[in-house]
Amino acid sequence: MKITPKNHEKVFAKDELLVTKTDLQGKITYANRGFMDIVEMDERVLIGAPHNIIRHPDMPKIIFKYLWSYLQNGEEIHAYVKNICADGSFYWVMANVTPSYINNKVVGYHSSRRNPTPKAMEVIKPLYEKLLQAEKSGGISASEKLMNDLLKEKGVRYDEFILSF
């Protein structure tokens, strides 16, 4: 499903939690009503679909590289993500993604998303624009260098940086 982005932001309630679960390949196995409502897709479309069905083209790939690196090491991760809806509009989230276990074996991933704070968005939006520009001109390695330089300058890991807002 190819979605054409529109410059229209959607927001969801401050106390609302958007939840999805995926299998190890990133295919959606569960989505709560809040998630389905904001993306304007129902279970027939979402269940079994790759989670990147909602990936907005403005998202720098390096963020997902960090996400998968943490998850594959069995660690939870927090990330600010701009997602796309079925109608092309977008919404921002602060996502917390954790591995799901059965008998000490990772069987999938659980993502809970909240509204990001305005303070975080003041930093994240321009940062992601710079990362995306670097990616377009020099590939993912250029955006990775930019992000790593920022983290080194601040003396923090990615997760510490994200949780500092």
Where are these regions (language model features)?
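Juxtadomain coupling helices with adjacent low-complexity linkers
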Residues: V107-H110, R114-F165
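Sensory/regulatory domains in signal-transduction proteins
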Residues: K2-L131
